[in-house]
Amino acid sequence: GLVAIVGTAYAIDKEFRKCAGCHKIEEGKKGGMGPNIWGVFGSPAGQVEGYRYSEYLKNSGIIWTRESLQAWLSDRKTRQEYFGKEVKDTKMMWTGIKKEEDMKMILDYLEKMK
């Protein structure tokens, strides 16, 4: 019911605040230190105008899917296992989403923002 919806919205907001220091998630808005991640699902990695990306990320051909985003938002070790060691050059200062339920919630949220 309503309590579950409000609880989920609060949990998403709490978890997303960690991202919001650098990223926006609003249609048509300019990003912050990091790109706006509205519509990130299905988009190519390292291609948002106005941001500097590593050569690796720009030329990777990575498309942001549930699987690739989960790897990217995980800890550094998981990110490097999935994408390769070159990904260590990313400017994104991120320690990763630790809890499985938080990861699912954030991915569900990002998937709807398009």
Where are these regions (language model features)?
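Hydrophobic aliphatic residues
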Residues: 41-44, 73, 110
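Solvent-exposed loop/turn segments at secondary-structure junctions
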Residues: 28, 43-46, 99
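Short microdomains enriched in Cys/His and/or Lys/Arg
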Residues: 40-52
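N-terminal export/targeting leaders of redox proteins
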Residues: 1-11, 111-114
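Protein kinase-like catalytic domain
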Residues: 23-26, 73, 114
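Axial heme c-ligation environment in periplasmic c-type cytochrome domains
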Residues: 33-35, 49-102
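Sequence/structural segment immediately N-terminal to covalent heme-attachment motifs in c-type
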Residues: 7-32, 37-38
